[in-house]
Amino acid sequence: MSPEEILQKAIEMEREAIETYAEMKREADRETAELLDFLISQEREHIKLLNDRLKVVRLLKKE
């Protein structure tokens, strides 16, 4: 698996986690929903970091 494929898979997994947390949140009590909101925000940050790294990998690949 190439670094680019690894990063793409990681991004996909983060997106799936967001979907899962969003589904759970619909049935959660208030405190748990707040925790799930926090986890969703963390997953979004992870996606940003992974996308930034993916851009770098692609730029280096072009050289």
UniProtKB/Swiss-Prot annotation:
It holds the Pfam family Rubrerythrin. InterPro entries: Ferritin-like, Ferritin-like_SF, Rr_diiron-bd_dom. GO terms for molecular function: metal ion binding; oxidoreductase activity. This is Uncharacterized protein AF_2240. It comes from Archaeoglobus fulgidus (strain ATCC 49558 / DSM 4304 / JCM 9628 / NBRC 100126 / VC-16). The lineage of its organism: Archaea, Methanobacteriati, Methanobacteriota, Archaeoglobi, Archaeoglobales.
